[in-house]
């Protein structure tokens, strides 16, 4: 079935780098082909390089949405709203009545939620962000918020056909660390203390 899709990447001329080795054991019902390579050939972007996106998740996205789905949504916000992952703000007369997400039955949204949940122990920007949201919002809301972020990342990668660049998020993490350090210095000064870095 996947062979019927047109190729957007030449896997012979530009092969994928080897997948990271993990502790996952081989499953009995694993496909007899390389889903990572096939999805890369069809989509033109290696989505498995995004934290939280394993080959089964990408296969679900491809089967449910097709290879050209990014063109069907004007912006990443439209895509997130269609999935029911963003808040459905109901405001009347300046009063907020509800900010809950809409009840949307979508296999894609469920796949993104599973991908978000897999980041609970990830040692990267997405894992740190998920744990911060979980501490502040609780697990269900943190999973939905992270799934929404993954959906936006997914749309941008497929819309602009650009590979995932972790350095973009590394800059965000460095910016957050600077803000944390500034808050610590401010708190220490308010208590007549001074923070000295360890040499």
Language-model features and meaning:
Residues 1-199:
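A detector of single, family-specific signature residues
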């Amino acid at each position: 079935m996947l062979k019927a899709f047109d190729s957007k990447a030449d896997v012979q001329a530009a092969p994928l780098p080897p997948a990271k080795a993990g502790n996952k054991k081989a499953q009995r019902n694993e496909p007899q082909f390389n889903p990572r390579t096939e999805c890369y050939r069809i989509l033109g972007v290696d989505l498995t390089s995004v934290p939280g996106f394993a080959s089964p998740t990408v296969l679900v996205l491809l089967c449910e949405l097709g290879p050209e789905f990014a063109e069907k949504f004007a912006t990443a916000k439209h895509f997130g709203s269609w999935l029911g992952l963003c808040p459905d703000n109901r405001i009347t007369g300046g009063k907020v009545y509800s900010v809950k997400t809409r009840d949307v039955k979508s296999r894609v949204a469920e796949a993104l939620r599973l991908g978000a949940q897999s980041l609970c122990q990830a040692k990267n920007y997405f894992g740190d962000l998920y744990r911060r949201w979980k501490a502040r919002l609780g697990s269900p809301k943190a999973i939905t918020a992270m799934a929404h972020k993954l959906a936006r990342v997914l749309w941008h990668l497929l819309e602009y056909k650009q590979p995932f660049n972790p350095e973009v998020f590394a800059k965000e993490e460095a910016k957050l660390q600077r803000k944390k350090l500034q808050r610590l210095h401010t708190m220490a000064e308010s208590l007549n203390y001074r923070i000295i870095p360890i040499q």
